[in-house]
Design a protein with these regions (language model features):
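Long, low-hydrophobicity, solvent-exposed regions enriched in small/turn-prone and acidic residues
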Residues: 1-188
């Protein structure tokens, strides 16, 4: 069991802001608390909350249940909550079938709008000298948007020479926490 609370104490008003937002004048940041419970060798329960001590309510919360057989075989189920419309459930998985082949997937479902707003799925092949990855992505900019976007990512890697195609590895690292492209496993 691991519990970690934290908060920043500001001794002066901050002089930096983002865009048109007013400069923050509160003397303290949100109270951040994190907890991790390792259920057994493969299962763990994780929680994170950002608590507003002025308003006495949470700003953002995350709770997840993770199953991890090893670095290349894991499944994560998480629920994210935030002020406003941010209320979603995420399912993500990476599963290595054998030393060369691996599957990956992520789906985000808005529990407030009752619809899937982000899907990523694909397959990856890795050999001694080359690798390739094919991924499909289907998303909405916001869960409430009716407009949908689709993309297909195809990337070839000639080890020691470089990549051809769009850089799907970077997108997948952002989408699936813990994802590392197979071609990067043994880079020097």
């Amino acid at each position: 069991l691991r519990l970690s609370p934290g908060q920043i104490q500001y001794f002066k008003d901050r002089r930096v802001n983002l865009g048109n937002q007013p400069v923050e004048k509160q003397g303290r940041s949100l109270l951040v608390s994190e907890g991790l419970y390792q259920i057994d060798q493969h299962w763990r329960l994780y929680g994170l909350t950002f608590w507003d001590t002025q308003k006495h309510r949470p700003e953002r919360d995350v709770i997840s249940l993770d199953y991890q057989l090893d670095n290349d075989r894991f499944i994560k189920l998480a629920h994210h909550y935030g002020k406003g419309d941010y209320n979603q459930t995420t399912l993500a998985a990476v599963w290595r079938i054998n030393p060369q082949w691996r599957l990956f997937y992520r789906q985000d479902y808005s529990t407030r709008h009752h619809r899937v707003f982000n899907n990523v799925a694909g397959v990856e092949y890795n050999d001694c000298c080359w690798a390739w990855r094919l991924a499909g992505k289907h998303w909405r900019d916001k869960p409430e948007d009716d407009k949908k976007h689709n993309a297909i990512y195809l990337e070839f890697v000639l080890k020691g020479l470089g990549n051809m195609g769009n850089r799907s590895g970077r997108m997948l690292k952002n989408e699936i926490h813990g994802f590392t492209p197979l071609a990067e496993e043994h880079e020097f």
